[in-house]
């Protein structure tokens, strides 16, 4: 029997795949558990339509991420932190601080999508990577300045 998987099933395939399985496996386990539906002409057409819509949606999200990446590449953020006389920070600059600086510029990115190569513990210029979409990553340039110069 041919079925369309609604969920990822180990050893069978991913959601949306059309696979052939034994009738008993489909009727007694996969279909009652909501893991699959029968592959009829109507469901196959609906699956194709859904895949096309999903592809359009993903392409639009990718385009938006690329536009945002261009905007971010042109920015140089300023992150303010308390520092001693030697330029050593009292603490570290984290991805949350960079996300907050981006937010102040009107760009919302989740802090978990921003990665620093090494802990930032000194004043100066640095780079961080921000993953905007599946295959769209951008370098975020930021400068750490002493908090006293911010006021």
From Swiss-Prot:
Keyword check for Ribosomal protein: yes
InterPro entries: Ribosomal_bL9 (IPR000244), Ribosomal_bL9/RNase_H1_N (IPR009027), Ribosomal_bL9_bac/chp (IPR020594), Ribosomal_bL9_C (IPR020069), Ribosomal_bL9_C_sf (IPR036791), Ribosomal_bL9_N (IPR020070), Ribosomal_bL9_N_sf (IPR036935)
One term of GO molecular function: structural constituent of ribosome
Gene of this entry: rplI
Keywords: Ribonucleoprotein, Ribosomal protein, RNA-binding, rRNA-binding
Similarity section: Belongs to the bacterial ribosomal protein bL9 family.
Protein function: Binds to the 23S rRNA.
One Pfam family named in its UniProt record: Ribosomal_L9_C
GO biological process: translation
GO cellular component: ribonucleoprotein complex; ribosome
Protein's name in the database: Large ribosomal subunit protein bL9
Organismal lineage: Bacteria, Pseudomonadati, Chlorobiota, Chlorobiia, Chlorobiales
TM spans (from-to): none
NCBIfam families found in the cross-reference section: L9
Organism of derivation: Chlorobium limicola (strain DSM 245 / NBRC 103803 / 6330)
